[in-house]
Amino acid sequence: MSTKSILAMALATFAISTPVLADDHGGPVTPKPYTTGATLTKAVQASITPDKALEILKAGNARFAADKPLKRNLKGRVQATALGQFPFASVVGCIDSRAAPEVVFDQSVGDIFAARVAGNTINEDILGSLEYASKVAGSSLVVVLGHTGCGAIKGACDDVQMGNLTSLLAKFKPAVAAASTPGEHNSHNHAFVNEVTELNVKQVVQRIREQSPILKGLEDEGKIKIVGAIYNTSNGKVSWY
């Protein structure tokens, strides 16, 4: 069997596991109001606008930063989502162990799609994943989530070269070049690193729009929003762009 055939079968199976927004008879879904902490259903997902999705994430981060996360029945969540998932948002984040999107936004099983790579950048694989999440699975928000003290950003600031990491860090060079913070342009200048981190998030948001006509089209139609954010590893709070 060809690679193309295998990929087509995999995508078909993936799509079946996450139905699009139609009822059991193929008709439109009647939206149902979102309830904080409840397991998402097809009908609830249909009611979550891009602005509402952003509001949910902001509220979740506020709970996390205040050390007041929701109490959830995780086993019940697993059982409730076993046959399908209806996430309301997608997050492109860094692999950093301190910045797990589900944790910093106080979300649970079945709530968000998460794509993670050092430096929260994108490539064709991640763009394809985001397109699936929004176009097929009904997610209404795309978040590019950077974080303070990012090792990948620091590596780019210092022009680190090491194996496959070299080509990854090269993706952050445009942000390094665009930064204008006074002083040395290396990882010892914390203000410079913070500026590069912010610029990288904004540039990735823009590249998503430029490199994915599907996501750009959905955003132009008001069906999704693409936003940037930075998680502060010192206080647990997320700033939005």
Question: Which residues does each PLM region occupy?
Answer:
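Gram-negative bacterial Sec-dependent N-terminal signal peptides
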Residues: 1-22
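Short glycine-enriched loops at secondary-structure junctions
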Residues: 93-98, 118-121, 147
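Acidic/His-rich structured neighborhood in mature extracellular/periplasmic domains
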Residues: 97-100, 109
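Conserved functional hotspot residues or short segments at active or partner-binding sites
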Residues: 144
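Short helix-loop-beta junction
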Residues: 105-114
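Divalent-metal-activated hydrolytic enzyme cores
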Residues: 22-84, 110, 119-137, 154-241
